[in-house]
Every structure is written in C-alpha cells, then in structure tokens.
Curated annotation (Swiss-Prot):
Coiled coil start-end: none
Name listed for the protein in its UniProt record: UPF0225 protein YPTB2098
Gene3D superfamilies: 3.10.450.50
A matching Pfam family: SEC-C
HAMAP family: UPF0225
Similarity-based family: Belongs to the UPF0225 family.
Length: 154
C-alpha cells in the first residue's frame, strides 16, 4: 500500500520527499527542501535535518536537543505559502505554516516562518528564519477559526 507524503502534496511519499531524504535526489528548489525537511521532522530523521542545515550553523552540535524534541512533538501538517528569490541567485526564502502538538500542550499549535535558504554548489541549505508577527485580533494560524489571542497566542 502506498502512503501519501507527509509534506501535504498529493504524491506518494516515494515519489515526493522520500528520494531527497534517502539521498538519491537533490532538492532543486528551496520549497522542495523545505517540504523534505518537514518530512524529516515527521520521521524523526536527525541525520537528514543536520545534513540540510547550512554548514555555518554547526547543526551537528544540536543533535541531542533535536532528538529530544522528537519525543515531545507530533506534526499535523505543512502549508507552503510562497517561495521568493533573495538578493542573489544563491539565496531564496520559503514562507510556510506548520501545525503540531507537543507534550506540554495537547492543542494544535501553528508555527509561521519565513525561512532563508542558501545554495552551495547546486545544493540548497536551510540557514535561518524569522517568524512574522501576528496581531492578537488576527485569525489564528492553527486553523481553529478563533482569534490568535484566544488560541495559540495565549
């Protein structure tokens, strides 16, 4: 039986993010890398996450804290909003919303981020991201339909 990819595409995992995580394909675009990194979080694949962080981040130093985070987090979905070019051809941004629950809070929480990616020798790497601010009266990103201040913004 085939399994849909956790990244939210309508493709089978082995036709979508699986080849990137297995290392048989290289993500040609930052949004593809973003989706495959989300799948790596779902699958608890610390090696892929570390390999796709920009080398300047020294992500291998965070290995244990990444693994500890896996035990507390359950992922519920990813929405890629936009992929935009950066200031030069080897920089790009991906804006997304991911939904999750953690051990400390059973309510689904949404994380909104604009991630920055840099390309080195045809490989894209995640380097950092910013979280756009959300007004207290804006609709919460988690999909509850409630205002942010009455939901995840508490």
């Amino acid at each position: 039986m085939s399994e849909l990819c956790p990244c939210g595409s309508i493709l089978n995992y082995h036709e979508c993010c699986g080849p990137y995580i297995l290392g048989t394909q290289v993500a040609a675009k930052p949004a593809i890398l973003m989706r495959s990194r989300y799948c790596a979080y779902v699958e608890k694949n610390v090696d892929y996450l570390i390999a796709t962080w920009h080398p300047d981040c020294h992500a291998q130093e965070w290995r244990e804290s990444i693994i500890q985070g896996f035990t507390k987090t359950v992922w519920h979905g990813l929405t890629v909003i936009a992929e935009t070019p950066g200031r030069h051809p080897d920089e790009a941004f991906v804006e997304f919303i991911s939904r999750f629950t953690d051990a400390d809070n059973a309510q689904i929480t949404a994380m909104h981020e604009r991630s920055r990616f840099l390309r080195i020798k045809e490989h894209w790497y995640y380097i950092d991201g910013i979280r756009p601010s959300l007004g207290r009266n804006d609709t919460c990103l988690c999909g509850s339909g409630k205002k942010h201040k009455k939901c995840c913004g508490r």
